[in-house]
Amino acid sequence: MLTRKQLDLLRFIQQRMRETGVPPSFDEMKDALDLKSKSGIHRLITALEERGFLRRLPNRARAIEVIRIPEAVASGPAEVVRFTPSVVEGGRSSAPVKPAPLPTALVSDESGHAVSIPVMGRIAAGTPISAIQSQSRSVAMSPDFLAGGEHYALEVRGDSMIEAGILDGDLVVIRRQDTANTGDIVVALIDDEEATLKRLRRRGSSIALEAANPAYETRVLGPDRVRIQGRLVSLIRKY
């Protein structure tokens, strides 16, 4: 049986993974649980690891994976967490274009059953490559890790997002949408030809596509050259 604090931490990590696709930082977890130091978070994570609910990946920033969810978290009512993330709202491009239709899975937040997410080829976490291809296969996911809406998955190729915990060979689960907030990790279609997985930043009237690896430069483009194809909401890794 988990303690109240352990359950609260697991809920918070699950919530942030659902909202942003990446785990929270230790400072964010400390603030969310109203703890005075990060050592308390380390103890909670160690306890959850020992019980088989979390896994930490060595030498990776924010590399925490939720392995399983206890019934109290998966089926019980969600609790309000005191932490409120600071979000910078991003505006729409001056000439929004409707994204190309894609096979997607519609996820109901009230469903307790696994849903099938179509895998739509590969996405570059490095130099942009062609992506958003035809459906090659599907992957089953618990709706607990997904927000409502339509979703598809892409296989990551490259290492430009490693400091965000996204590795070559991972499957990224994308919520289909054509707008995003500054700081979101998105699938960006450049010049209607190349797709890449990057963090979105707004720089005046321009859009910056930012890597999470210092070996890669940030690309700054006009809004007419970039179309958002979706936002990262979850990640799947096989061992």
UniProtKB/Swiss-Prot annotation:
The record marks 125-126 as: Cleavage. It catalyses: Hydrolysis of Ala-|-Gly bond in repressor LexA. This is LexA repressor. Its EC number is 3.4.21.88. Belongs to the peptidase S24 family. Homodimer. Residues 26-46 bind DNA. GO terms for biological process: DNA repair; DNA replication; negative regulation of DNA-templated transcription; proteolysis; SOS response. It holds the Pfam family Peptidase_S24. PANTHER family: LEXA REPRESSOR, LEXA REPRESSOR-RELATED. One of its GO terms (molecular function) is serine-type endopeptidase activity. Represses a number of genes involved in the response to DNA damage (SOS response), including recA and lexA. In the presence of single-stranded DNA, RecA interacts with LexA causing an autocatalytic cleavage which disrupts the DNA-binding part of LexA, leading to derepression of the SOS regulon and eventually DNA repair.
